Amino acid sequence: AYFVEMQKLQEEYAGKLNIRIGIELGLRTYLKDYYEELTKKYPFDFVIGSVHNVPYKKDVEGNILYTDPAAEKLFADRTDKEAYRLMMETTLENVRTFGLLSNNLVIWIML
């Protein structure tokens, strides 16, 4: 619905406004295939990749738990330096995993 409506606006305002269609994706490495399909299906003018969550510990079953980078629990059991390193490592892992999802991908890291 979003993409179709934006295309209608592009047509309606052609010659008056240069309307671009974009999307922001909260990056998690396990969503790579889904994001690749999405960006192939819709020819976005730009895609913003962001990091809103970082892994901070595992639960008793070994599942990775994520938290907001600004959350106190990220800093609870580690030094500031360790917490910031974890955020940067998560960002780097996403950049390595996603590279360019398509020719129009722009990665903006938001922590």
Which ranges hold each PLM region?
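Extended substrate/RNA-proximal surfaces in nucleic-acid metabolism proteins
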Residues: Y2-L111
